[in-house]
């Protein structure tokens, strides 16, 4: 079955994969995908030429067809992060929020993996380049658990092939 496109929260493009895709084949759980689709901003860490980290706020969307996280933004192909990924594909993305202040409850998803710089432009010449992250390690906190005692929330970590 072909992939379906739609609009997610905030009017962002959402790509759905084939209906035959099972959760076991997906790098993210259903709850993690829902969390990502509800967020508009993440922080992308890449490696600069001198080996130091660069961390920038970025737009994002989950690509269920490929099981990747696509980083989007204006003039992406001219950005330092795009050049960093072109040179060294190691990257990490953190998406977090405060779910509650009473009691204090935070949630986050950290995705470490291999990133690729994907050039692109539309017929009008606009830059449509993206950074595509292929998850290799996923850390989540407060995503899978129902609201409850915050001190019982545990970090979940898993490595992917």
PLM regions and their residue ranges:
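A short local loop/turn or secondary-structure capping micro-motif enriched for an aromatic residue
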Residues: 63-64, 77-81, 149-150
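Short beta-strand segments
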Residues: 40-75, 93
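Short, structured beta-strand-loop surface elements
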Residues: 75-131
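Structural motif
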Residues: 66-68, 90, 114, 137
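Short, basic/aromatic recognition patches
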Residues: 14-43
